[in-house]
């Protein structure tokens, strides 16, 4: 109750982030390229919030989000699977929207190298947090940040399994944000957790036959 009785700028930003997050999730669920526009705006809101709450890795992640949004938009808008026609996942270049990258499955040959990169990122970010910040949750903060970086890359590639990566991130973040007393954002990520399951099923239906 203290949170709502002392409602100020930080709390208002938390609420604004909730609204933007819901818009982003809807656009992602629909596989709309406009999700990348929201991906440029939303990090500004969440970045300030995370800095105020001492979630420094999450703050740094917001900078990555902005850069990834530019990359993601370019990938979805101009990249096509037939440019990688020698790969199994690119045999059908058809796209639900003309000129856009189609949804495909995460190729098995990339699982191991991506997992290695993810573990390396986790270790590096954890070391940075315990060495250079006063983070009270370095293990969880570094884990969600590292996995989010991988998931965002998978989203830019338009792999359906990016939803499964976000499922793990969102579940952990829900608990983390409750602990850090950011209730609106915690509710948003709890909703994200549920929607990740539905989004995965929805994207599977959109994969070209």
List where the protein language model places each region.
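Polytopic alpha-helical membrane-helix bundles and their juxtamembrane interface segments
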Residues: 1-31, 35, 42, 79-87, ...
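Hydrophobic/aromatic-rich structural module bridging two neighboring secondary-structure elements via a short loop
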Residues: 39-89, 93-99
């Amino acid at each position: 109750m203290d949170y709502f009785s002392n409602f100020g700028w930080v709390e208002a930003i938390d609420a604004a982030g909730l609204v933007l997050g819901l818009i982003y999730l809807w656009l992602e669920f629909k596989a709309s390229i406009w999700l990348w526009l929201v991906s440029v705006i939303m990090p500004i809101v969440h970045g300030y919030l995370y800095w105020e709450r001492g979630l420094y890795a999450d703050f740094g992640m917001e900078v990555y989000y902005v850069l990834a949004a530019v990359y993601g938009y370019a990938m979805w808008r101009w990249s096509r699977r037939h440019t990688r026609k020698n790969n199994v996942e690119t045999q059908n270049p058809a796209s639900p929207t003309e000129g856009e990258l189609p949804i495909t499955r995460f190729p098995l040959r990339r699982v191991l190298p991506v997992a290695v990169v993810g573990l390396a990122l986790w270790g590096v970010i954890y070391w940075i947090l315990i060495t250079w910040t006063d983070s009270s949750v370095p293990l969880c903060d570094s884990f969600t940040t590292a996995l989010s970086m991988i998931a965002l890359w998978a989203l830019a590639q338009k792999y359906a399994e990016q939803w499964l990566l976000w499922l793990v991130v969102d579940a952990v973040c829900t608990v983390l944000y409750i602990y850090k007393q950011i209730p609106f954002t915690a509710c948003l990520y709890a909703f994200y957790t549920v929607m990740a399951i539905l989004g995965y099923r929805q994207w599977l239906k959109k994969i070209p036959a």
